[in-house]
Amino acid sequence: MSRRRQIYEGKAKILYEGPEPGTIIQYFKDDATAFNAEKKGTISGKGVINNRISEHVFTRLSHIGIPTHFIRRLNMREQLVRQCEIIPIEVVVRNVAAGSISKRLGIPEGEPLPHTLIEYYYKDDSLGDPLIAEEHIACFNWASPEEMQDIASMAIRINDFMAGMFAAIDIRLVDFKLEFGRIYDGDFSRVILADEISPDGCRLWDMNSGEKLDKDRFRRDLGGESEAYQEVARRLGLLDEDRNNGEGGPGEVFDMSAHRSRLRGTPTPPKK
C-alpha cells in the first residue's frame, strides 16, 4: 500500500491527500492543547469520539441545508472531506458567558447573554488568535461582505439547530467555534462549513448539574475528560449505533423557540 502524503498537521488533526482530486483525509488525534498550545496533553480516545460526533453533527446540519466539507467517515479516526480554502477567521457563537468573554468584560461565568453573540478571531497562533471586528476583515480582505453575510447567517442557523439538538439530551450549548472555507466553481466561489464540531470546540454543560462535558475539563485540570466526551456521544446515541445496526440516534430534536428559556436557565451548581 502506498504511503499517503501528509499535507498538514495541526493541534488536533492531521490532513492527508485524499484518494480523489479535491478531497482530503482528516485524521483525529488524541492530543489536547489549551491556552494557545501552552498546555499540552493527551485525552485517551478523544480522536475516535470527536470523529464520530463531528460526523453526526455535520450530517445533520447538511439535512437543514448547511453546506459542509464533510463527505463520509472512513474509519474510527478518519473522515473524507472536500478540499477548500480555509478563511482565516474563527467564528465563536456565544449563548452564555464563559471563558474569555467573562475575563474580558467581567461578566460572571454562566450568566445568559441578552442575545446570541457572534465574535470573530484572526487565525494566527503566533498572535494568539486575536479578537477582531468586521472592519478588520473588510480592511484586510480576509472575506468579502457577501461571504461575511453568509457566515453570520449560517452561524445563527447552526446555533439554533445545535442548541435544540443538545437541549433534547439535557445539555446546554454555552458557546462553540466554527471555521469556514471557500470552494470554487470556475470564476465563482461559495462558503461552506469546514473543520469539525466536537467537545474540543464547544462548551457543553449538563443542564441539571452544570457539569462540564467539554475540553474545559482539560483546561481547568478537572479530570474525567475521556468520560465527559464519551457521555456526550452516549447521549447523542452514537455509542449504541453498532448494536442498533446503525439506526441509533438521539431521538427528537426540540423546537428552539419553545425551549429557548430552558436552554438559558441558570443551572444548579455542581456538587463538590
Curated annotation (Swiss-Prot):
One of its GO terms (molecular function) is ATP binding. Keywords: ATP-binding, Ligase, Nucleotide-binding, Purine biosynthesis. Residues 239-272 are annotated as: Disordered. Its EC number is 6.3.2.6. It comes from the Bacteria. Pathway: Purine metabolism; IMP biosynthesis via de novo pathway; 5-amino-1-(5-phospho-D-ribosyl)imidazole-4-carboxamide from 5-amino-1-(5-phospho-D-ribosyl)imidazole-4-carboxylate: step 1/2. It catalyses: 5-amino-1-(5-phospho-D-ribosyl)imidazole-4-carboxylate + L-aspartate + ATP = (2S)-2-[5-amino-1-(5-phospho-beta-D-ribosyl)imidazole-4-carboxamido]succinate + ADP + phosphate + 2 H(+). The keyword ATP-binding applies. GO terms for biological process: 'de novo' IMP biosynthetic process; cobalamin biosynthetic process. It is an enzyme of class 6 (ligase). The keyword Ligase applies. GO terms for cellular component: cytosol. PROSITE patterns: SAICAR_SYNTHETASE_1, SAICAR_SYNTHETASE_2. Belongs to the SAICAR synthetase family. This is Phosphoribosylaminoimidazole-succinocarboxamide synthase.
